[in-house]
Each structure stands twice: as structure tokens, then as C-alpha cells.
A protein has these predicted regions:
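Bacterial N-terminal signal peptides
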Residues: 11-22
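Beta-strand-connecting loops/turns
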Residues: 42, 85, 102-103
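Intrinsically disordered, low-complexity Pro/Gly/Ser/Thr-rich segments with frequent PxxP/GP/PP motifs
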Residues: 71-98
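Short acidic, flexible loop segments centered on an aromatic residue
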Residues: 54-70
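N-terminal secretory signal peptides that target proteins for export/translocation
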Residues: 1-9, 94
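Beta-sheet-dominated interaction scaffolds and their linkers
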Residues: 27-48, 79
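Structural preference for beta-rich elements and adjacent junctions enriched in aromatics
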Residues: 34-38, 50-55, 92-350
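N-terminal leader/targeting signatures
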Residues: 5, 14-15, 147, 165
């Protein structure tokens, strides 16, 4: 029996609701977001809060992070001083934390300046890849020891699981969808688009800049379990180039291994990408942090599912230049969110 089944999806859907509450966010003096943990809470990591000054004047306030019940975080609050439009990461140490089976942690962050208080509630996940080398054969049974990150869009569920070893980075994306459309010469088709970026990178806002990311597209060929990987961007790729619908055959990346299967209404995209071309910017080692985000393309169903939305990026962090265009994609009215979401490499989930 497959370890990531439709039943598992149903239980996760009932037990987890990712949410964010911050009324009138655009009018508030600061914006708040708790980042995903990059190692398991039980190991005592740091929790990071992003604070952005949204007003034209300097901001000085106190930031408090309320963890799940039974946890202990220090300090209780920290002062932040921000210049106009400045953003800072504020760290809190998790002295006592517990791992949740469904990898969902309810937190609340508060910014207080005088009589003005901003509150945001989120459910955050641990986004980290344990050390293991899976066989890329379309069978997800080997992925039970990976850390599952789950989200729901349009009533359909998606789960991400990752592994790493010294030679490769591996990814399993389980997509609940009504039908699977394989790659074809014309018309929209299903796929998974992922962006991997160094921890010191930033997405530019001008097309004359470079991509500064490694970006890939996974798709089913329409035959058996065969899948293809296309390399849409490398760090030196001009962003203007990424906004053209280039011929995918010229972008096929044969160094990656891909398998695609479908069982009980769930499509499984399984892929292994070599670290060698990325090693100069992302060195594979325990404790390494980098950026990873995923778009799921379901053109005849939910449309685009964006991990950045679930991870709590702010509405103004949508950026068309963060993702490459490609023939067969069906984009929504709004651009997708930025691709700079924290991810980590760890030894094990135990």
C-alpha cells in the first residue's frame, strides 16, 4: 500500500487549516510573517519572524512570538527598529518544542508600538530535507521518512517531500487532481515547476537582471511512468529570457531523473536533480539553508497552486519575474508569489 495515499490526504485536510489573520494588512504600520522552520522543532532551532515597515516613517516596536501550547521560546519579546520601508528578520530561540505528526504548527506574532498593535496568526511547517537517496521509480513508499509539507488549493491537496544526499536533491510532489494531462505540442498540460535558489539570492524586479536561481519543470510524457525535466533557468539566465515561451525541447534536462505515476486520484511526481551544477552556490551539507518553492499546474482543475501563498508571503510579494513562462502553462490573472521560501537540509526526521 502506498505510504502517501488518498486516505492520508483526507486526514491531513481535516486536521490542518493553513491560515493567516491580519485585518487591514495594507493599512497597518508593519507586516509580519513567521518563516517555515528549517529543522525539526524538537531539535531546538531558531524561529524567524520577518517584519516590514509599511509606513513612510521609522518604526520602533516590540515583537512577540507565541508558540504552540507547551513550547518555550526565548526571549519573550524583542525590540525592532526599522527605517522607512525596511525589512528585518527577528530570531527567537526554541528552548522546548515538539514535533507534530502532520507538520503543522499554530503560531501568533504580535508587533506593539505604543497603543498600536498588529497581530498575525499562521500555521507554519518544518520545510527540511532529510538525508537519503530514493529510487526514482514512481513508487512513493520510500518517502515515508521524508518530512511532508501539505497545502490545499481549490479543495485539492498537494504534498511536498524532499530528500538530499551528497550527489543529488530529490523531490516528491503528490497532487490530488481529477485528471492528468501529459505534455503535448499544443494546449495546456499538467506539471510541477520548482525554483531552487541560494540563501543569499534575491528576485530582481527588472527584466534586465539575471535569474539567480535554478528552475525546473517536471511533466508526464503521456506514456507509462516516463517523465521529463526541463531546466527553465540558471543563475546567469536573463530574466527577460524567462518571460518568453521558449521551445521546451531545447530546455530538456537529461541529467535529472523523473517518474510520474497516478493512483486513486493522486498524481505522484518523483524527481532527482544533481547537485553538481548547483554546488558552487548551494553546497550539500547538514544544516544548509537555501530557498525552494513550487508551483503546481493543474490547468483543467484548480489552476496554479502556489506554495508561496500557503507559506504566508505578503500580497505585494507577487512577482511575475520569479517564475519562467513556458508553452503549455495556463497562468492566472495575478502573477505568482516570489520563489524565495526557506528550506533546509537535515540528517533525519527522527
Amino acid at each position: 500500500m502506498r505510504s502517501i495515499s488518498r486516505t492520508t490526504f483526507a486526514r491531513a485536510y481535516l486536521a490542518i487549516t493553513f491560515f493567516s489573520v491580519s485585518a487591514g494588512i495594507a493599512a497597518e504600520p508593519v507586516a509580519l510573517r513567521v518563516e517555515s522552520f528549517t529543522v525539526l522543532p524538537s531539535t531546538g532551532p531558531l524561529a524567524f519572524v520577518e517584519v516590514e515597515n509599511r509606513q513612510p516613517d521609522p518604526y520602533r516596536g516590540m515583537i512577540a512570538l507565541k508558540p504552540p501550547e507547551g513550547w518555550r521560546i526565548v526571549p519573550a519579546e524583542r525590540e525592532v527598529v526599522l527605517a522607512e520601508k525596511e525589512t528585518k528578520r527577528i530570531s527567537f530561540a526554541i528552548e522546548l518544542g515538539r514535533n507534530a505528526a502532520l507538520n503543522s504548527y499554530a503560531v501568533e506574532v504580535t508587533a506593539t508600538a505604543g497603543d498600536t498593535k498588529v497581530v498575525r496568526q499562521q500555521n507554519v511547517a518544518c520545510a527540511s530535507a532529510p538525508y537519503f537517496k530514493p529510487t526514482i521509480d514512481g513508487n512513493p513508499d520510500e518517502w515515508k521518512d521524508a518530512i511532508g509539507v501539505r497545502f490545499t488549493e481549490g479543495g485539492k491537496r498537494t504534498e511536498l517531500r524532499t530528500y538530499w544526499n551528497r550527489r543529488s536533491f530529490s523531490l516528491l510532489v503528490a497532487v490530488e487532481e481529477d485528471t492528468l494531462i501529459g505534455q503535448r505540442r499544443s494546449g495546456a498540460f499538467d506539471g510541477v515547476q520548482l525554483a531552487i535558489s541560494p540563501a543569499d539570492s534575491r528576485t530582481a524586479t527588472s527584466p534586465d537582471k539575471v535569474a539567480d536561481r535554478y528552475e525546473f519543470l517536471l511533466a508526464w510524457t503521456g506514456q507509462g511512468t516516463a517523465g521529463k525535466c526541463f531546466r527553465l533557468a540558471a543563475p546567469e539566465t536573463q530574466l527577460a529570457t524567462t518571460q518568453n515561451n521558449r521551445d521546451l525541447s531545447s530546455l530538456q534536462y537529461d541529467d535529472a531523473t523523473v517518474a510520474v505515476t497516478r493512483t486513486d486520484g493522486v498524481t505522484y511526481y518523483e524527481c532527482s536533480i544533481p547537485f553538481k551544477p548547483m554546488r558552487d552556490r548551494i553546497r550539500p551539507s547538514e544544516g544548509r539553508e537555501f530557498f525552494l518553492s513550487v508551483l503546481v499546474h493543474d490547468p483543467d482543475g484548480t489552476g496554479i497552486r502556489d506554495w508561496g501563498k500557503t507559506a504566508g508571503l505578503w500580497p505585494w510579494q507577487r512577482n511575475r519575474l520569479a517564475w519562467s513562462k513556458w508553452p503549455g502553462a495556463k497562468w492566472g490573472k495575478q502573477p505568482p508569489y516570489d520563489n524565495k521560501l526557506h528550506w533546509g537540509l537535515c540528517a533525519s526526521k527522527y
